[in-house]
Amino acid sequence: NKENIPYVTIEEFKKLKHPILLDTREEKEFDISHIQNAYSVGYDNFNAKSVKQKYSNLNDTIVVYCSVGIRSETIGTKLKKLGYKNVYNLYGGIFEWKNNNQPVVDNNQEITDNVHVFSKEWSEYLIKGKKVY
């Protein structure tokens, strides 16, 4: 990571007032599990125009995350270029979230242990939870 987008830890995230949480993983990853109240914006199919329409206040606090923080940094950088002023990258992504016993939910908003690990290489970073490929 180049750290263009400042990190926010899990504890810091929990103290934020009404953050907009954006999941920058692919839809199939989001469908397996995601952090509650997150909105899927994708990575390969990220659509800046639709994000701007949905979140028009450039002063809103936005927290982006992915598996470990690489893709979310890329999307966070795009958001900054669109004019968003308060963009943060969730440190360690959904893997760090799950490794710290934080809940993730499936598409039915049911708590699940499943986490899409993106690849075998990245799967080593998920210590807790059930790895899904």
What name fits each language-model region?
Residues 67-71:
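Gly/Ser/Thr-rich loops at beta-strand to alpha-helix junctions
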Residues 1-10, 31-60, 73-133:
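Rhodanese-like catalytic fold shared by cysteine-dependent sulfurtransferases
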Residues 1-4, 15, 20:
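N-terminal capping/interface segment
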Residues 18-19, 59-61:
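A general structural motif
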Residues 13, 20-25, 38:
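Short hydrophobic beta-strand that contains or immediately precedes a catalytic carboxylate
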